[in-house]
């Protein structure tokens, strides 16, 4: 019988063990990925149809960025995917080292297994995450981007000037900006690199948040009123509407990104994704026009 090799407890390993133990103690019976009820944020906007609900596993991640049929991809279109060394499996989720990314579409900006969130329909989406420390350098992020904003520039619309892009970015939460959550709705437009940015004011909560505990960050969206509302652990915390939520949002289709970023690369930390779930409602007629069709999922080379 081989004698097992014992490794010394490195700071990164200790952080991972503490994060795993904390989550197990606090959230083992409250994982959103095992909760079949409809959250209040979904009910408020009429997003009553479950779209997906998932407890992430390492086997769900594609590390090439291009394989069909995966739930998560380890990168986005702006750069190469992260390799397997950035990720670990925990009992209750996937751990990412600083620099890790999980996105629900391929790096080629084509859909994966999870459906996109159509801006023509009300929706609610939430993610349950925890970090290994509350260091201010940590920049854990949960956000939505339209799949149309890609290298093919599919966010250039008929009637606009050549290469003039328009898209809506919805940041469900970002860490390191203050003691509490940081929630932004951003209307982007223009020709690269001279983009115009319109963002909601006062996005940062002054209420301290312990990010080492499993927190549930959610956002609801209504295409009728072009209003978004952010939710923290089941309670509404902030709201935004036009001009920060632009009309172009109704024509776009959104995917989820969860990323363990850093403000100045000072702190080494891990971010755990424990679960995600999304709900949608019926398509609506935008501003008296025709119902905006949802983008169909399709494969890619």
Please state what every model-predicted region is.
Residues 11-21:
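Bacterial N-terminal signal peptides
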Residues 235-253:
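Short, solvent-exposed beta-strand-to-loop segments that form ligand-recognition rims
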Residues 247-267:
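Predominantly extracellular/luminal carbohydrate-interaction, adhesion, and secreted-enzyme modules
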Residues 28-157, 163-168, 175, 243-244, ...:
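Low-complexity, Ser/Thr/Pro/Gly-rich disordered linker/stalk regions
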Residues 153-216:
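Glycine-aromatic-enriched beta-strand/loop faces of beta-sandwich-type recognition domains
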Residues 229, 264-273:
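Extracellular carbohydrate recognition
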Residues 2-13:
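Bacterial N-terminal signal peptides that target proteins for export
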Residues 213-229:
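Localized edge beta-strand/strand-to-loop motifs within extracellular or lumenal beta-rich domains
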């Amino acid at each position: 019988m081989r004698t097992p090799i014992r490794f010394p407890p490195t700071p990164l390993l200790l952080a991972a063990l503490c994060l795993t133990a904390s989550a197990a103690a606090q959230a083992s019976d409250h994982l959103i990925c095992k909760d079949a009820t409809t959250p209040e944020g979904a009910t408020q906007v009429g997003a009553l149809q479950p779209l997906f609900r998932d407890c992430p596993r390492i086997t769900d991640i594609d590390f090439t960025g291009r394989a069909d049929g995966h739930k998560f991809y380890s990168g986005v279109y702006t750069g190469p995917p992260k390799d397997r060394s950035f990720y670990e499996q925990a009992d209750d989720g996937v751990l990412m080292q600083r620099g890790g990314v999980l996105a629900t579409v391929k790096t080629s900006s084509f859909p994966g297994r999870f459906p996109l969130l159509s801006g023509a329909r009300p929706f609610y989406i939430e993610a349950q995450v925890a970090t290994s420390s509350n260091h201010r350098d940590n920049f854990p992020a949960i956000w939505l981007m339209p799949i149309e904003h890609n290298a093919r520039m599919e966010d250039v619309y008929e009637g606009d000037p050549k290469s003039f892009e328009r898209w809506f970015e919805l940041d469900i939460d970002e860490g390191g900006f203050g003691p509490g959550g940081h929630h932004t709705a951003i209307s982007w437009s223009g020709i690269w690199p001279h983009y115009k940015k319109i963002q909601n004011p006062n996005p940062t909560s002054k209420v301290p948040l312990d990010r080492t505990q499993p927190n549930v960050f959610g956002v609801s969206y209504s295409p009728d009123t072009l209003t978004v509302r952010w939710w923290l652990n089941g309670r509404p915390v902030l709201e935004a509407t036009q001009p920060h939520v632009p009309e172009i949002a109704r024509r776009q289709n959104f995917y989820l990104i969860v990323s363990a970023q850093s403000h100045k690369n000072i702190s080494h930390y891990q971010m755990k994704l424990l679960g995600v779930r999304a709900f949608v409602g019926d398509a609506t007629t935008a501003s008296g026009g025709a119902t905006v069709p949802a983008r169909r999922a399709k494969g890619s080379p």
